Amino acid sequence: MKTGLRIALVLLAIGPCSGSFCAARAQSETGCILRVHVDGLRNVKGVVGVLLFRSADGWPEDVSKSVRHDASPIAAGPRSATVVFNGIAAGDYGIVALHDENKNMKLDRNLFGIPKEGFGFANNPHVGLGPPPFRAAVVYVGCPTTDTLIHIIYK
């Protein structure tokens, strides 16, 4: 009798939902939140756009191959922005950010193909003559919330 009572009290204390089962259920019902914080902007013109990729296909500029994309205004004081993605599935995402100063929804380049606007990648990998490989900019997004910081660079 005492053992049954102890089990009942333990189950009552734990509650009806605990462990990874309920975490998985909550994730499937609401999805995860990803907050991409972007700093290092040279001015407050335009917006900061962020693209999420699940694979190297289209990486890093093909918006049509990104699984999600969004933009955010730039905060005047710190010259930073945060783009929030709600309801995304947990998993690995390659993340790229763009300081779209003229709001034309693309990375403007000069005659030599060098970007005229700022850009950056998750994990802030070294950028040489081309974009880093997809795997270098992958972040695992877990529930309930994941935050990542991207430093914008200008060439």
Regions found by a protein language model. Give the residues of each.
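Bacterial N-terminal signal peptides
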Residues: 8-19
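Surface-exposed loops/turns
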Residues: 77, 89-90
